[in-house]
Design a protein with these regions (language model features):
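Bacterial N-terminal signal peptides
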Residues: 3-15
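Structural microenvironment flanking redox-active thiols in thiol-disulfide oxidoreductases
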Residues: 66-130
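Loop/turn elements at helix/coil->beta-strand transitions in domains of secreted/extracellular proteins
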Residues: 51-55, 81-86, 113-118, 147-148, ...
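Thiol/disulfide oxidoreductase modules built on the thioredoxin-like
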Residues: 113-115, 124-168
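Rossmann-fold NAD(P)H-dependent dehydrogenase/reductase core
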Residues: 26-43, 66, 128
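A short beta-strand-turn-helix
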Residues: 33-54, 75-80
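Amphipathic alpha-helical repeat scaffolds
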Residues: 59-63
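N-proximal helix/coil linker or "cap" segments that precede and/or mark the start of modular domains
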Residues: 18-33, 50
Length: 168
């Protein structure tokens, strides 16, 4: 996760900036959707969550060999969240490694790894059925080939960096 931390901080200037958010930037349409939170009746609109802020979007799976990366992602969220970086995990079973129930996935994320950043309920991240967020991201960068692919988006919603599963 060190490479990710350094790249995010340097690319976005977060390390020296007390708070990074450009509220004047219009939220891109692909983020303007109500998405179900993991194991919750609540939804989140990414425009409300991240308008004008850089965002790290990650496809996750609770039974993947890379699941330990939740610790590093949480550290990134804790370290740079107050400065404006928004971390969002999209649980997905596209690679057949997500828990059978949302309750189990939530236990792994929230209890086992202490995740406090926003987690979206299991949804497709590849192919024709990908969520609007990932459909757009996949047009800008390579679609995820595996779980825990990370995309760093600037405040305008543009992908500025893609990190493969092994970056952690």
């Amino acid at each position: 996760m060190l490479k990710l931390l350094l790249s995010a901080a340097l690319t976005l200037g977060l390390a020296a900036t007390p708070a990074f958010a450009d509220e004047s930037v219009a939220c891109p349409a692909f983020l303007d959707h109500d998405l179900p939170k993991l194991h919750s009746k609540d939804t989140v609109n990414l425009c409300d969550l991240a308008a004008g802020k850089p965002m790290l979007v990650v496809n996750t799976a609770s039974h993947c060999g890379f699941t330990g990366q939740f610790k590093g992602l949480e550290a990134l969220h804790q370290r740079y969240g107050k400065q404006g970086l928004v971390v969002v995990g999209f649980a997905s079973d596209d690679f057949n490694q997500e828990a059978k129930t949302e309750e189990e996935a939530a236990t792994i994320c929230f209890k086992n790894f202490g995740v406090t950043f926003t987690m979206i309920a299991p949804s497709p991240v590849t192919g024709a059925n990908a969520t609007p967020v990932f459909a757009h991201i996949n047009q800008q960068a390579k679609a995820p080939r595996w779980n825990f692919t990370k995309y760093l988006l600037n405040e305008k919603g543009e992908v500025i960096e893609r990190f493969g599963s092994t970056t952690g």
